[in-house]
Amino acid sequence: MLAIIDGDVLLYMSIWNMDTKEEAKEKFNELFTNTLESVFATDYVMALGGPDNFRVDLFPDYKGNRAKSKSNRPDWFLDLKSDIVDQYEGCIFTSNCEADDMVRIWANECTKANINNVVISVDKDLDCITGVHYNPRKGELYEIDKEYANKFYWKQILMGDPTDNIPGIPKIGPKKAENILKDSEDYMATVCKAYYDFYGKEGYSYLLANGRLIHIWREIEDHFKIKKDFYDKAIEE
C-alpha cells in the first residue's frame, strides 16, 4: 500500500503547542510513523507546499483571510519544512502548485498503474479523489466512489471556498448546491447554467476564474477549462 501524504497537514499538526523546532520535528516523526502504521503502508510519497503557487498569481487575495494564522507561525517554521524534505526521501516541495495538487496527481497516476494507495489528509477538498482516504487527525479511514467525487467537485465549483477566499456563487452553500445538482444529468452543464443565472453576461468569466482556483490538478499544469461553445449551449437549454 502506497501512502500519498499531504505533508502540510502533518506539518501543522506537529507545530501545535510546540516551543522548539526539535520538539516539532520529533512530533512530526511520530505522526508520520503512526500514520503509515495505521494504514499498513509499505511506501509513501509526500508533498509540502513550496514558495510559489499559481493560484496566488491568478488571484492575489487567495487565502488572504489566513494572514493571521501565517503571522502566528513560529520563527523556525520554514527551517522545519526544509529539515523534513531533507530527512524524508519521498518528500518534495511543490513547484507552482499546492500539496493538494501533487496528492491528486499521484493518486491519479496510481489509479492508472493499478497501484493500491491511500490518500492521507484532513482536507475535505481532496474528496474529489476516488479511492481510500485516511484522516490522521480523526484516525478515520473512508472510501470515496466516483459519483460522490464528481458531485463533490461540482458542488465546490458552485460554492467556492470561504476558507480560501474563493467566492463561487454568492449565497450558495452545501444544501443549495446539492439541490441544484440533485436531478442533473450533466453536472458541468448545470453549473454553467447556474453561473449564467447569477452573473449574466459575465458568467463564463466568473466560472473560469472560480474553477481555476478550486480545481485540483490531476496532472501537471492541468488547469480548469470549459469550452465557450459548451458553455453557450448549456445556458440555452
Labelled PLM ranges:
Residues D8-V9, D57-P60, K124, D164:
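Flexible, active-site-adjacent loop/turn segments at secondary-structure boundaries
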Residues K27, A41, N65-E236:
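Extended two-metal-dependent nuclease catalytic cores across DNA- and RNA-processing enzymes
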Residues E37, P60-Y62, D197:
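Short, mixed-charge, low-aromatic patches
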